[in-house]
Regions:
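Acyl-donor-binding surface of acyltransferase catalytic domains
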Residues: 129
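Extended, loop-rich substrate-binding clefts of extracytoplasmic carbohydrate-active enzymes
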Residues: 82
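Structural signature of tandem-repeat unit edges
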Residues: 2-7, 65-74, 85-103, 112-126, ...
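Secondary-structure capping and domain/repeat boundary segments
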Residues: 1-63, 90
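A short, hydrophobic secondary-structure junction motif
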Residues: 53-62, 104, 108, 169-171
């Protein structure tokens, strides 16, 4: 039970869940995603609290945020799933069904304009950057998170900007279309591809 004051900003902690439950979408006023959505994936209220009565809230999970395809090398490629529009943040898992997720596919998140943040494991080997984040006008950050299993990751991030790493140095792979303000390019950057800033 939690007390919320009418007209104020609010948040509810996301529930603990197993992977089998799917990804937490948010808290709703009805079961199974029915009723009114109250929070985002982090449990932060979508707008100030507007009820003076007691309200029961229910967690909603989706198993269709992402779609996985098994590749010939026995690793998975990931792209958007049918429920992607329900999310404002997405975290790509390092594994799926016990196998490595190695690839962010072509057009993976094309035109997913509800998404503002994408978190990707440092174990990812291939990101089809020319199309994976195309037409994502509200995307402000692509973050690479540590899995603790990779010594020399293929990709890294800085303040939401995606870099590709090699022995010679870094290359800016993707600059989010929704990112604003000043940005200082990392000093060990050796390549800035043509049109990397064209959507900004």
């Amino acid at each position: 039970e939690k007390e919320v004051v009418f007209g104020t900003e609010f948040s509810f902690d996301p529930p603990a869940s197993d992977a089998k439950d799917g990804m937490f979408v948010g808290w709703y006023t009805g079961t199974n995603g029915t009723g009114v959505p109250l929070t985002d994936v982090d449990g932060v209220g979508l707008k100030p609290w507007n009820s003076v009565a007691d309200v029961y809230i229910y967690p909603y999970y989706s198993s269709n945020a992402l779609s996985f395809t098994l590749k010939a090398d026995d690793t998975y490629q990931v792209i958007k799933g049918l429920d992607i529009a329900k999310f404002n943040k997405i975290t790509v898992p390092a594994t799926y069904n016990g196998k490595k997720v190695s690839t962010i596919g072509a057009n993976a998140f094309n035109s997913c304009n509800t998404i503002t943040v994408i978190n990707i494991p440092d174990s990812i080997e291939i990101i089809e950057v020319s199309t994976a984040f195309r037409n994502m006008k509200n995307l402000i950050a692509v973050n690479i998170y540590e899995t603790g299993t990779i010594n020399a990751p293929r990709y890294s991030s800085d303040d939401g900007v995606l870099y590709a790493n090699d022995v010679a140095g870094k290359e800016i792979s993707y600059f989010p279309a929704g990112k604003s303000g000043e940005y200082a390019i990392l000093p060990d950057t050796i390549r800035i591809p043509a049109k990397v800033f064209y959507q900004v």
